[in-house]
């Protein structure tokens, strides 16, 4: 079996550790813990790393298409490797959730998230496993675009690092148990 773990974000130093890139942050943490490095794949339009866990190949993916076109990379990888939607896990930011909160879901709408909207359009379904990490709503009249492309303030950054650790735990639990429903029961709350 093979699993595709995709963190959403925007490529480039300009977007490093911005709110919209918490998916990349989590994928980077998983790569670091597994001691694997990313290589850029032009065909898939993604940075890829892989490792084996309990005989299962795990791909860590950071699309390099920019957020709004993330579905291109996801669809290409699913198709090339002949994977089912059940083999996919998407990790991304959610501005409708409090900073640092996490929520695991097996389906749902895009909720205004353009990366998720792109994935739904490209793979043809809204039924896929996902982990949402809260980044909070904009404050003091700040636009949504400015909010998601800005860095976390100090206190929020500490909370985000803690939530990334919790998501890391949940993803590892999911990979061990091979049961997303059980993972949701354990980590949602």
UniProtKB/Swiss-Prot annotation:
Gene3D superfamilies referenced in this protein's UniProt entry, alphabetically: Peptidyl-tRNA hydrolase
Protein name: Peptidyl-tRNA hydrolase
SUPFAM superfamilies tied to this protein: Peptidyl-tRNA hydrolase-like
Protein's gene: pth
Task performed by this protein: Hydrolyzes ribosome-free peptidyl-tRNAs (with 1 or more amino acids incorporated), which drop off the ribosome during protein synthesis, or as a result of ribosome stalling. Catalyzes the release of premature peptidyl moieties from peptidyl-tRNA molecules trapped in stalled 50S ribosomal subunits, and thus maintains levels of free tRNAs and 50S ribosomes.
Record-stated family: Belongs to the PTH family.
Gene Ontology terms: cellular component: cytoplasm
GO molecular function annotation: peptidyl-tRNA hydrolase activity; tRNA binding
NCBIfam families on file: pth
């Amino acid at each position: 079996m093979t699993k595709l773990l995709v963190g959403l974000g925007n490529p480039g130093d300009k977007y490093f550790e911005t709110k919209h890139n918490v998916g990349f942050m989590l994928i980077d943490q998983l790569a670091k813990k597994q001691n694997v490095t990313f290589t850029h794949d032009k065909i898939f339009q993604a940075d890829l790393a892989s490792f084996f866990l309990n005989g299962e190949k795990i791909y860590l993916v950071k699309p390099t298409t920019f957020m709004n076109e993330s579905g291109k990379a996801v669809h290409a990888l699913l198709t090339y490797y002949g994977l089912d939607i059940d083999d996919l896990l998407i990790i991304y930011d959610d501005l409708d959730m409090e900073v640092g909160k996490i929520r695991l879901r097996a389906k749902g709408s895009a909720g205004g998230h353009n990366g998720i909207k792109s994935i739904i359009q490209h793979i043809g379904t809204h039924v896929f496993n996902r982990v949402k990490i809260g980044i909070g709503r904009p404050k003091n009249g700040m636009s949504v675009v400015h909010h998601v492309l800005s860095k976390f303030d100090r206190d929020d950054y500490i909370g985000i690092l803690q939530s990334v650790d919790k998501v890391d735990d949940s993803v590892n639990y999911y990979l061990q148990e091979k049961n997303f429903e059980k993972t949701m029961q354990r980590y949602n709350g």
